[in-house]
Amino acid sequence: MEKTQYPVILFSHQGLSIYQTHQETYGLDNYQEIQNLLQEHNRLHPERKVIASFNGHTHAENIGGIWYISITSMAYHWLGEDYEYIRYSPEVDKNFRWIKYTAPFKEPLFTTVEISSNGTIKIAGKKTEWVGPSPFELGFPENLKPYVHPWITKRKLRF
């Protein structure tokens, strides 16, 4: 980041912010340390600051002037053994032994992100449906509805 002449966008699998589910906490253990380093970089280099961090687990929030944005998985949401449900044929279940612990999407989820020099991040929305019952129809915790859904939310964020 020290050598770039441009704004910085990070991509990671695990989030650089944190959120708690009924089973576990998602995010890196040292997320606070990383956030502090990024915010310090922004303080020292406002002309080439970190504007966003994209990941695949949590949601969108602005922390210290940096957008931490999750993009829902392309294929499914992991539910775990407590929510086992066979959604496909016995053959598919046999060949993909973990699939019964997921809530798969009918179609792949993907999006486009436009980052503009006018200080905006535009995320195109995309919707699909669950294959079979939703996680919540299987008893998945209702308080996780803001994070577990078969769509990517359309957003316009300012940085």
Question: Predicted segment positions?
Answer:
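Binuclear metal-dependent phosphoesterase catalytic core
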Residues: 61-159
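Intrinsically disordered, low-complexity regions enriched in small/polar residues
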Residues: 8, 21, 28-36, 40, ...
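Active-site metal-binding loops of divalent metal-dependent hydrolases
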Residues: 14, 56-58, 73-74
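Acidic carboxylate-rich catalytic motifs and surrounding loops in phosphoryl-/glycosyl-chemistry enzymes
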Residues: 51-58, 126-128
